[in-house]
From Swiss-Prot:
The active site is at C118. This is Peptide methionine sulfoxide reductase MsrB. GO terms for molecular function: peptide-methionine (R)-S-oxide reductase activity; zinc ion binding. PANTHER family: METHIONINE SULFOXIDE REDUCTASE, METHIONINE-R-SULFOXIDE REDUCTASE B1. Zn(2+) binds at C46, C49, C95, C98. It catalyses: L-methionyl-[protein] + [thioredoxin]-disulfide + H2O = L-methionyl-(R)-S-oxide-[protein] + [thioredoxin]-dithiol. Residues 7-128 form the MsrB domain. InterPro entries: Met_Sox_Rdtase_MsrB, Met_Sox_Rdtase_MsrB_dom, Mss4-like_sf. The lineage of its organism: Bacteria, Pseudomonadati, Pseudomonadota, Betaproteobacteria, Burkholderiales. It comes from Ralstonia nicotianae (strain ATCC BAA-1114 / GMI1000). Its cofactor is Zn(2+). Binds 1 zinc ion per subunit. The zinc ion is important for the structural integrity of the protein. One of its GO terms (biological process) is response to oxidative stress. Belongs to the MsrB Met sulfoxide reductase family.
Length: 128
């Protein structure tokens, strides 16, 4: 992790939902985030540090209510760790640059990877 800020700095920078999702690993409600049904062409960046994370060309409708992608923009931007919360074992996805919680990755996605990166809209900022 190369970008580190104090809790107060993150709170000043982020909205309440962005802070809860990215810094406290909360999950936004399905079908409520700004990007779950967003199909413009461009890049989805980390809301905390601006790192490019996902390209719109890898986004697909998984029917789950969260933005879903079959691959990150490259292998250097995402960190994965085992998450034992809520009585489940899942793989948490974090921004490698700032440690922001993004969501989880599952092995039920489409070709070519077979992966579904299920990401909270509050963890993302869309742009070019």
């Amino acid at each position: 992790m190369t970008i580190e800020k104090t809790d107060a700095e993150w709170r000043d920078q982020l909205s309440d939902i962005e802070y809860r999702v990215t810094r406290e690993a909360a999950t936004e409600r399905p079908f409520t985030g700004r990007y779950w049904d967003h199909w413009a062409r461009g890049i989805y960046h980390c809301v905390c540090c601006g790192t490019p994370l996902f390209e719109s060309s890898t986004k697909f409708d998984a029917g789950c209510g969260w933005p879903s992608y079959f691959a990150p923009i490259n292998g250097e931007v995402i960190a994965e760790k085992t998450d034992h919360s809520h009585g489940m074992v899942r793989i948490e996805v974090q921004c490698k640059q700032c440690g922001a919680h993004l969501g989880h990755v599952f092995e039920d996605g489409p070709a070519p990877t077979g992966l579904r990166y299920c990401i909270n809209s509050a963890a993302l900022k869309f742009g070019d």
